[in-house]
Amino acid sequence: MSLIPSFFGNNRRINNNIFDPFSLDVWDPFKELQFPSSSSSAIANARVDWKETAEAHVFKADLPGMKKEEVKVEIEDDSVLKISGERHVEKEEKQDTWHRVERSSGGFSRKFRLPENVKMDQVKASMENGVLTVTVPKVETNKKKAQVKSIDISG
């Protein structure tokens, strides 16, 4: 049996078996149901990475297909970073016939509580190739080297 799907469709059931874990033609009871595609869930669940460097907190959000005009970056209550956006449905023309609609429309919103050591007034955001980058600079702290003073023990 081949692990590569046949170009001739599912009519070729040579050596396929429902008990074979590698069979590609196992009956799927959910096959005909319409579930949201991964692209539509990508909007609703906007994936965000948050890393902390010595100088800043950096957030990167994957927002494929979104324009910067469709995205908002806000600071709420001087401590919460809010990234939100909304993609609108394309205008449908009367003479058009749609065969499949998989790209989603809708909105998303993500919130992150920021630590106290950040400069809220210097937050910067940029968007390139569907990736939003938000940089929140940290307050510079004067870290002094630990000074050790030897104490004489009397007695």
UniProtKB/Swiss-Prot annotation:
Organism: Arabidopsis thaliana
A cellular component term, taken from the record's GO annotations: cytoplasm
Subunit structure: Forms oligomeric structures. Binds to AKR2A.
Cell compartments where the protein resides: Cytoplasm
Name by which UniProt lists this protein: 17.6 kDa class I heat shock protein 1
One Gene Ontology biological process: response to heat
Conditions for induction: By heat and osmotic shock and salt stress.
Family: Belongs to the small heat shock protein (HSP20) family.
Domain sHSP: 39-154
Name of the gene encoding the protein in the UniProt record: HSP17.6A
Pfam families, per database record: HSP20 (PF00011)
Functional note: Possesses chaperone activity.
Keywords attached to this entry: Cytoplasm, Stress response
Main subcellular localisation: cytoplasm
Keyword Phosphoprotein in annotation: no
